[in-house]
From Swiss-Prot:
Any one Gene Ontology molecular-function term assigned to this protein's record: structural constituent of ribosome
Organism: Metamycoplasma arthritidis (strain 158L3-1) (Mycoplasma arthritidis)
GO biological process: translation
Protein name: Large ribosomal subunit protein bL32
HAMAP family: Ribosomal_bL32 (MF_00340)
GO cellular component, one term: large ribosomal subunit
Length: 65
């Protein structure tokens, strides 16, 4: 058999425990090469540059969705 809680968890204790569960807004910066919004410390998925160097090949997608 499972263990049963000794006392009821109060609303305040529940709220304090869940206070760290909120979602944070994503931090975005402008790419120095193509001026698109990107996540910092990652290669740009639009042009493939990171720290002024081409690090990944990016396929051109001319189709408009």
């Amino acid at each position: 058999m499972a263990v049963v809680p000794k006392r009821k968890t109060s609303k305040q204790r529940k709220a304090l425990r869940r206070s760290h569960h909120a979602l944070e807004a994503l931090t975005l910066v402008e790419c120095k090469n193509c001026k698109q919004s990107i996540v910092p410390h990652q290669a740009c998925k639009y042009c493939g540059f990171y720290k002024d160097k081409k690090v990944i090949k990016v396929a051109l997608n001319d189709q408009v969705k």
